[in-house]
Amino acid sequence: MTLSRDDAAQVAKVLSEALPYIRRFVGKTLVIKYGGNAMESEELKAGFARDVVLMKAVGINPVVVHGGGPQIGDLLKRLSIESHFIDGMRVTDAATMDVVEMVLGGQVNKDIVNLINRHGGSAIGLTGKDAELIRAKKLTVTRQTPEMTKPEIIDIGHVGEVTGVNVELLNMLVKGDFIPVIAPIGVGSNGESYNINADLVAGKVAEALKAEKLMLLTNIAGLMDKQGQVLTGLSTEQVNELIADGTIYGGMLPKIRCALEAVQGGVTSAHIIDGRVPNAVLLEIFTDSGVGTLISNRKRH
């Protein structure tokens, strides 16, 4: 393909802007939570795969954790298994857990691995059960109303929380030039399976690896102020203030708390990225403007 002079000039501009960032992140690990619209559009899926392969090619180490809620819901519906949610978490009985494992560990994980490999990468698919990659325990959910004298414990089945990460396995794969692609299924002390929120798995993996960045792909432009303007950079202190005054609320709270916990746990920065934008991951790390909100321990003005 022959580029016009204007196109060639644009490519040169992009590369010159990216070079300092590439130098800064060579040898660093970036954990990317892949989900939402970025997993649904064929164009965005291909763009994500190219982004990940390019990162690896320039010496950056991407680790991918993926979701798959809509795909799980689709198969449950086809099997006439009803879905129930409590506080945004899917109640996961034994039959639902079987479906979760089939969809996340089979269909979705292998599709992503295949896509990355078709674009020149060496991706390898894993669930948290492989070599006890993601150790977990049952998540306890409680609810209390003013009328109750003590909280009610709600059983939401095989829903778990992360208790440990097999860092040795991930480091071995990364050093072998593989791109790990992780399905968010954890394993308990007795070998039982747990369905875990993909954001939470990504955050814990990033903490365990002492990653440079945790990148959460979403279907929004980033965190916004009360006027609807994207907040491009925030400190953990500023994020807590936005939670306290109600600017950040509802469905974004678990994602933001995951990002905060990762940064407080040693990850250099967490990013809430607009996954609807083509090449969102590269734009966020290799350009001055980015496409989302960066959260770090550093105070920003």
UniProtKB/Swiss-Prot annotation:
GO biological process: arginine biosynthetic process via ornithine; L-arginine biosynthetic process
MF-aspect GO terms: acetylglutamate kinase activity; ATP binding
Catalysed reactions, as listed in the record: N-acetyl-L-glutamate + ATP = N-acetyl-L-glutamyl 5-phosphate + ADP
Entry superkingdom: Bacteria
EC number in record: 2.7.2.8
GO cellular component: cytoplasm
Taxonomic lineage of the native organism: Bacteria, Pseudomonadati, Pseudomonadota, Gammaproteobacteria, Pseudomonadales
Cellular compartment(s): Cytoplasm
Keywords noted in UniProt: Amino-acid biosynthesis, Arginine biosynthesis, ATP-binding, Cytoplasm, Kinase, Nucleotide-binding, Transferase
Gene that encodes it: argB
Job description of the protein: Catalyzes the ATP-dependent phosphorylation of N-acetyl-L-glutamate.
Residues binding substrate: G68, G69, R90, N195
Record-given protein name: Acetylglutamate kinase
Pathway: Amino-acid biosynthesis; L-arginine biosynthesis; N(2)-acetyl-L-ornithine from L-glutamate: step 2/4
UniProt enzyme class: transferase
Residues flagged as site, Transition state stabilizer: K33, K255
Keyword Calcium on entry: no
Protein family per UniProt: Belongs to the acetylglutamate kinase family. ArgB subfamily.
CDD domains: AAK_NAGK-C (cd04250)
